[in-house]
Structures are given as structure tokens and as C-alpha cells.
């Protein structure tokens, strides 16, 4: 949409009606690109912060308790395969989160090397993809991790309990 605002036919129309000049349209487009980049940058840095300071530590606590549960159940002579399977699954999500968080931090740092339209496109094409890659294992873990460990309200709590 921003890109279309500076197309020759759009510029001609706005200039023809005396609404905006080409320079004004280009200036407005640059401002919109900058605002978009700033918004995505804030969202990405917030995701990195939430993952690193809240979600990953919570999952580490949960997997530690789950591992202790597996050992206790085995010591009691019972089958701990379900707990062990959950531990393996959640540990896998934890590993994915750690890698995705590092990748997101790297892409955010790289985004700072661009400006204007190029930066906005980098945020759209690269940073948002990295954000989705972090969100995927977090969403999966949220469905499994005990709510006593989860640091934020779940989607269902937000949807049905507010």
C-alpha cells in the first residue's frame, strides 16, 4: 500500500487534484516505512525479552519438575513413559525457542543496517519470519506446560475468562 502511494499514476492523480505533490507523497511514504519498521522492531525486541526472561526460564522450571517426576515414578516401579514423552517434547520446544530467539536477535541487529524502504522490507521479509519461527514452538509449549509455570495468561484464559 505504501509502495502504491508513490507510483506515477498515483502521483499524477494527487497532483492533478492539488492534494499532494510528488515530494510530499514520497515524504509521507518514508514516514510510513519508518513507522512500520519501528513498530516491528519494538515487537521483535519484546518477543526476545519475553522469551529470554519469562518463557524459557518457566519452561526450564517445568522440565526440571517433570524430570524429577519421571525419576520418582520410575523409583516407585511404575511406568513413567508418558511423563518422559512430555519431557522430551517440551525439551524439544525449548531447544527450538532458544535457537529461534537467537536468530531473531540476529535479524533485528541486521535490520539496523538498513534505512527507509529497504529496512521496512527487511522487517517484513526477514524479521517477521523470524518472529513467526519463535512464536511456533512457544505456542506449542503453551498447550503442554502446566499453567502454574506459564508466566502469562493463556489464549483461552484471555478469550473466555476476561
Give the location of each predicted region.
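Short, small-residue-biased leader/transition segments that mark boundaries at the very start
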Residues: 1-2
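C-terminal catalytic subdomain
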Residues: 8, 17-86
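Surface-exposed polar/charged interaction patches
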Residues: 20, 69, 76, 100, ...
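Amphipathic alpha-helical coiled-coil segments with heptad-repeat character
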Residues: 41, 45, 80-83, 87, ...
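Charged, amphipathic alpha-helical oligomerization/scaffolding segments
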Residues: 50, 54-61, 65, 89-103, ...
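Structured alpha-helical bundle/scaffold domains in large eukaryotic membrane-trafficking regulators
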Residues: 63, 67-74, 109, 142-153
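Extended, well-ordered alpha-helical scaffold/bundle regions in very large, multi-domain proteins
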Residues: 75-112
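Long amphipathic alpha-helical coiled-coil segments
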Residues: 111-123, 146-161
Amino acid at each position: 500500500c505504501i509502495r502504491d502511494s508513490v507510483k506515477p499514476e498515483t502521483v499524477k492523480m494527487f497532483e492533478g487534484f492539488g492534494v499532494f505533490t510528488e515530494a510530499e507523497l514520497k515524504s509521507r511514504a518514508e514516514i510510513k516505512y519508518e513507522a512500520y519498521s519501528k513498530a516491528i522492531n519494538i515487537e521483535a525486541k519484546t518477543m526476545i525479552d519475553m522469551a529470554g526472561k519469562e518463557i524459557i526460564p518457566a519452561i526450564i522450571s517445568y522440565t526440571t519438575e517433570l524430570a524429577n517426576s519421571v525419576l520418582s515414578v520410575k523409583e516407585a516401579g511404575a511406568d513413567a513413559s508418558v511423563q518422559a514423552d512430555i519431557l522430551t517434547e517440551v525439551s524439544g520446544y525449548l531447544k527450538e525457542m532458544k535457537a529461534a530467539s537467537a536468530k531473531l536477535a540476529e535479524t533485528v541487529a541486521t535490520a539496523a543496517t538498513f534505512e527507509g524502504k529497504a529496512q521496512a522490507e527487511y522487517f517484513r521479509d526477514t524479521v517477521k519470519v523470524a518472529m513467526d519461527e519463535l512464536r511456533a514452538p512457544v505456542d506449542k509449549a503453551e498447550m503442554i506446560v502446566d499453567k502454574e509455570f506459564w508466566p502469562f495468561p493463556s489464549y483461552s484464559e484471555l478469550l473466555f475468562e476476561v
